[in-house]
């Protein structure tokens, strides 16, 4: 039996501002944007040409979900953006105003830095060794 993770839900405040951040600042591709009803859309994004695992931008619909925006993992890094050229992507993201929470560092597993999205969700930018 073949199985894989198809999408990971990321709670956002607004579909359009989230799409803009991810496509303009992180150079993600908008895979799908389908209106389901007056308030809900099916919005999938992914880095470049990656489509096997996508991020589902899910607009918060309840006060409980709104509280989780930017903190779905209780302050820990939530998502890991792997790159084949750390310094290229780090400088490109920095020039576009992405907020980095630390200086890049070398770890036994690779070069890494923590950054935040527009809502405070923590990500690792990571080039594995």
What are these regions (language model features)?
Residues 12-15, 36-38:
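Conserved beta-strand-loop-alpha-helix junction that forms the acyl-donor binding cleft
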Residues 14-15, 84-87:
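Helix N-cap motif at beta-to-alpha junctions
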């Amino acid at each position: 039996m073949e199985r894989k993770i198809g999408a990971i839900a990321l709670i956002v405040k607004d579909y359009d501002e989230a799409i803009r951040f991810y496509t303009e600042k992180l150079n993600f591709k908008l895979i799908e944007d389908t209106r389901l009803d007056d308030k809900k859309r099916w919005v999938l994004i992914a880095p470049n040409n990656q489509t096997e695992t996508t991020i589902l931008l899910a607009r918060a619909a309840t006060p409980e979900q709104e509280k989780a925006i930017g903190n779905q993992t209780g302050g820990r890094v939530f998502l890991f953006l792997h790159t084949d050229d750390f310094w290229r992507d780090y400088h490109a993201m920095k020039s576009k105003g992405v907020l980095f929470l630390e200086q890049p560092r070398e770890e036994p597993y690779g070069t890494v830095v923590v950054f935040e999205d527009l809502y405070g969700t923590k990500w690792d930018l990571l080039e594995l060794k």
